[in-house]
Design a protein with these regions (language model features):
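Conserved class I S-adenosyl-L-methionine
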Residues: 107-115
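A short N-terminal interaction module
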Residues: 1-72, 295-303
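Conserved SAM-binding strand-loop segment of SAM-dependent methyltransferases
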Residues: 154-164
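Conserved SAM-binding loop
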Residues: 146-147
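Conserved SAM-binding loop of SAM-dependent methyltransferases across substrates and taxa
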Residues: 118-130
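Class I S-adenosyl-L-methionine
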Residues: 1-20, 165, 181-401
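Conserved SAM-binding motif I beta-strand of class I
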Residues: 132-137
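Conserved alpha-helix/loop element of class I SAM-dependent methyltransferases that forms part
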Residues: 89-106
Length: 401
């Protein structure tokens, strides 16, 4: 299905305006900016406008969308999360509520926390389960801060500074600990790191695995490297370049109004500048611009002068700046309409990527569930893979990618 509908999601709305989208675009041509924002995060509205164009897409998503976990945690003392931002703390609680049920059976053997950062997840886990935690993190400064937290709270949490990009783990202490650890967990490990996590955990025959994947595009390869044999046998991975992998997580549900306004203004300027550049260099392909930290005194004219300098373009003395800025605003609305079509495929792509990992775990002898550990407004990256090593796992297949 994703392959059949590839022309509707595999394009860059900033630089491309595919003609075959005309029928789908006509469905939302009357929507203003506020309505387009609302459409962007509402599957029911997306189905209302585009179900005729993509009926199988919304049917498949409805069938595959996992349910949300509703497990309640016991009352948690305030001192355990005083330095954790609210939304991050909600994510950690949701993850632990789902994952610690399996970990309780692991006894006093240590758990592994992968891509630990400061070990916020590990601290809650060890408090809930009375189970030691080994928190593995490659940034030494985060390890030091996390260890200070754990020592202050007298929790059995040990940090190991190790290069988790490599397989096997380079640190001898981490390697020996991993062999003994029955429970492995990773909350929002990025791209290659969560793939390394799955390979390493299964190689060490972890009893239970809990993974919330994130940032699928953060990898060295130019295209997605499928994990399970079923996905490897399809043509889809070869089409999933970094742009497609970014699409799977391209969501601004958690962005504040100010952040959205700043992003919209930046796009207005970039598109307005591109319109200006095309009048000076007609027919030339789009030229990338580096990211720019905007200052309070910036305006459209100053932005264009900066961009022209980067492109080594001499601007004419007289330019109708308001006209080009207005053109940029209109182009951004067109971009939003094109993205409204692409964004219908965000969740299906993400589900496919998660199912690839789930089936890989089944192939390694695990029984697997896929569920949501928090609401999408807390984090749009709310998929959680829970795997339990089971000799009968092969008899409980998930829907294959």
């Amino acid at each position: 299905m994703l392959l059949e509908l590839q022309p509707y999601w595999d394009f860059n709305a900033f630089t491309q305006r595919p003609a075959h989208l005309a029928r789908a675009l006509s469905k939302i041509a009357h929507l203003d900016e506020a309505q387009l924002w609302a459409l962007d995060n509402d599957v029911e509205q997306q189905a209302h406008y585009f179900a005729d164009a993509f009926p199988t897409l919304f049917e498949w998503q409805a069938q595959c969308e996992p349910t949300q976990v509703n497990t309640q945690l016991p009352s948690i003392p305030f001192w355990l999360h005083t330095d954790i931002p609210g939304r991050k703390w909600q994510q950690i609680q949701g993850f632990c509520a789902a994952a610690t049920q399996k970990a309780h059976a692991s006894g006093t053997a240590p758990a592994i926390e992968w891509c630990a950062g400061k070990g916020h997840l590990g601290r809650l886990h060890t408090w809930l389960c009375a189970q030691p935690v080994i928190s593995i993190e490659w940034q030494n400064s985060l390890c030091l801060q996390g260890q200070q937290y754990a020592n202050k709270l007298k929790l059995p949490q040990q940090f190991i500074n190790a290069d988790i990009h490599q397989l096997p783990l380079s640190a001898t202490t981490a390697q020996s600990t991993a062999t003994q650890a029955p429970h492995w967990m990773a909350l929002h490990a990025c791209g290659e790191l969560h793939c390394h996590f799955l390979h390493t955990a299964t190689q060490h025959k972890a009893s239970t695995i809990a993974l919330a994947p994130c940032c699928y595009h953060r990898q060295q390869a130019t295209h997605y490297q499928a994990l399970c044999t079923a996905a490897q046998a399809t043509a889809l991975p070869a089409t999933l370049n970094l742009q497609a992998l970014r699409l799977a997580q391209q969501n601004q549900i958690t962005a504040g109004n100010r952040e959205r306004e700043q992003r919209a203004n930046e796009l207005n300027w970039r598109l307005g500048y591109e319109a200006l550049r095309q009048t000076l260099q007609p027919g030339t392909p789009y030229k990338n611009l580096p990211s720019k930290q905007k200052q309070s005194h910036d305006n459209f004219e100053q932005f264009c002068q900066w961009a022209a300098l980067k492109h080594q373009i001499t601007l004419p003395a007289t330019i109708d700046w308001p006209a080009f800025e207005a053109q940029g605003q209109q182009e951004r609305l067109q971009m939003m309409r094109h993205d409204a079509i692409r964004h219908c495929f965000r969740r299906p792509l993400e589900l496919w990527l998660a199912l690839d990992k789930a089936v890989f775990l089944e192939e390694q002898g695990y029984s697997v569930t896929l569920q949501q550990f928090c609401a999408s407004h807390v984090s749009p990256r709310n998929l959680l893979l829970l795997a339990n090593r089971d000799i009968n796992a092969a008899n409980s297949p998930l829907s294959k990618p």
